[in-house]
């Protein structure tokens, strides 16, 4: 098994800043980290920080260089159990999840994260295409589970994926090289063109958050994106928080509910694999990233976490009635699998943003074998 992830034991100002940076990401969230907070907590000056990293994203890039390759290997190790990591590794794990998730919108971090992820993925692919497909599900579940855990702790039960994937064959009975883009289902997205003023503001807020995160949004940016004045927004929305709340309702509850209802047409596990691929289409990019950013922010915002937890429950209730996996499965297995389906959707989107070609993988093969593995587990 891959050994636990640790920082260098050398004592230096740089190492101290790195450790403090990781701790702040874990406690406050990646978008709340600042030079002042890092320097103050490390007991060092701001010029000392700038001499090492130049910027906060530069710190994230250095953290990734220090432990990223080892952490990726650990994430793709079937024998590893992230939910059982000790205190130090647990903190590093949560921080690395946030860096990987946000890196695509931070050029200075992404220029380090992307090539490291690409090198790791080349190693995964050397084990075969079906192996790569299974790893994408394992790592996707682990990412999605960690992003969701502070919001709904029951998501840790999705770790059943490790056992299920371990029970799958080395090779799939389905052939390599299938065209996975044929006859994909059309999934609902977020309309970007509307004459309704409130809807125009909501769609603009969704777009800004998807590009820059919740903390990167402001009423001025939303107004510019909607091509309206800030003064025209305030009579209809009391604050930016209300805009975000309304955006949340529109993008998460409405779109998720619509797409899960469409999933009723997925009569087999193979159809579910096609739904995953369809969800990675370019037309769904804004929706995917908005959903990711809401999870990233809710990890450190109890009010938002409470609203998102209710949305997760609604989604899971629909999953129970629509998923081809859950027909005839005992109750004790239903809950972990529905959380797995939820976590996988988020984690696969994060891998997609990191440059992994998950949209070109044949998820139907893994989906079919996953269902068979569950059947073997329950006898």
Residue ranges and their predicted role:
Residues 64-71, 248-256:
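Short, basic, alpha-helical segments at the C-terminal edge of helix-turn-helix-like DNA-binding modules
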Residues 10-37, 41, 189-221, 225:
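Short, amphipathic alpha-helix enriched in basic
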Residues 17, 32, 55-60, 216, ...:
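Short amphipathic alpha-helical segment with a characteristic S/N-K-E followed by hydrophobic residues
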Residues 107-139, 284-285, 289-292, 302-327, ...:
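Amphipathic alpha-helical packing segments from all-alpha helical-bundle domains
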Residues 30-33, 93-102, 244, 255, ...:
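Short, structured motif recognition centered on aromatic/hydrophobic residues
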Residues 42-53, 226-237:
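Short hydrophobic/aromatic patch on the recognition helix
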Residues 110, 114, 128-190, 305, ...:
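Hydrophobic/aromatic-rich alpha-helical bundle segments in the mid-to-C-terminal region
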